[in-house]
Amino acid sequence: MFRITTLNVNGIRSATRKGLTQWLEQSKPDVVCLQEVKADECDIPAESRPHGMRAWYHCATRRGYAGTALLTAKRPREVRLGFGSKEFDAEGRYV
């Protein structure tokens, strides 16, 4: 079975401290879609990514605001960040 998990984490650092990574490792999804990451990619703790998963982040230009992430067990053919809108792509809402 192919499993997709989507979560509004309301802050990746907080969700990681509350056990997000362990829960994802137990549930073993193939794809994880995260909304409201609220961190720059460089500020996201390495332990927030389950072992063996690849990650792509689309962070908002405003620190601590919005942001999305895609984690996958297998490398996808293509990953697109943003959808070409100057107005909305700065909010980090599309992976």
PLM regions with names:
Residues 38, 46-95:
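Structured beta-strand-rich core segments of catalytic domains in phosphoester-bond hydrolases
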Residues 1-50, 60, 65, 81:
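N-terminal, active-site-proximal structural segment of metallo-dependent hydrolase catalytic domains
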